[in-house]
Amino acid sequence: MGSLALEAGKIYGLVGPNGAGKTTLMKCICGLLRPDGGVLEIDNQQVEVANSEILSQVGTNFINSDSLKGFSLEYIYNDHVFYHRLKKSFTLENLLDEVGLDVNKKMKFDAMSLGMKQRFLLGLSTIHKPSLVLLDEPFNGLDPDGVDLFIENVKSLSNDRALIISSHVLRDMETFLDYVIFIEGGSILKMKSMFEIRKEYKEGLKDYYDEQKQKCN
C-alpha cells in the first residue's frame, strides 16, 4: 500500500474497480481489520484494533443496520452518546436538524427509508467530533434531493476534519471532492486533486477514473 497523508478540512474520494480494496482500506483505518503490512496513524498515533482512545477519533457509517432494528432513534442516539462518553450539548434534535430529517425521535430506525437511514448514520458518525470520518457508499438509497442535502452536510462537516468517501457515483462525487485517491489490488496507486482533474480531463472524474482503470488492465 502506498503512502497517504490526509489534511484536516479536505474531502477525499476513494475510487477503484470492484474488489480493489476500498472498503478493506477503510476498515483498516478505523481498526476493524489489521493491515497486511505498513502502519496507519491518526494524529501521530498508531491505529490498533484494541486502541479505543485513538479509534474514538474516527467516525464511520460502518454500522450493521440489522443490529438497529426495533430501536428508536432516541435510543440509538443515547447509546452512542454513552459509548463515547459525550455530554449531551449536541442533542438528538440538533442531529436530526443538521441532516434534514423531520421525524419523531421515537421513530424506529427500521421504519425509515434507506436514504433517511443514510442521513441519520451520517449525523451519528460525527457527533463525537472525530478528526477523521469514513463513509462507505453513502449515496445508496438517496433520491436527488437527498444527494443534494448530503453534499451540503458533507461540506459543512469537513471544516475541521478530514473525510474519506468511497462511492461508485462519480458524477456526484466530483462536485465536492478536494482530492481523488485511486486504489487497485489493495494498493493506493495515485492521489490527484480535483482541481487538476477538472483542468486535464474533459469529462472530469469519469475520464480520469477510466484512464487509471485502463492502466491497471
What is the role of each PLM region?
Residues 12-17:
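The feature captures the beta-strand-to-loop junction immediately N-terminal to the Walker
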Residues 30:
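Helix-to-loop junction immediately C-terminal to a conserved catalytic motif
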Residues 38-49, 53-54:
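Conserved ABC transporter NBD signature motif
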Residues 69-85:
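Q-loop/switch helix immediately C-terminal to the Walker
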Residues 78, 89-104:
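Conserved ABC ATPase "signature" region
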Residues 133-137, 142:
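Catalytic Walker B motif of ABC-type/P-loop ATPase nucleotide-binding domains
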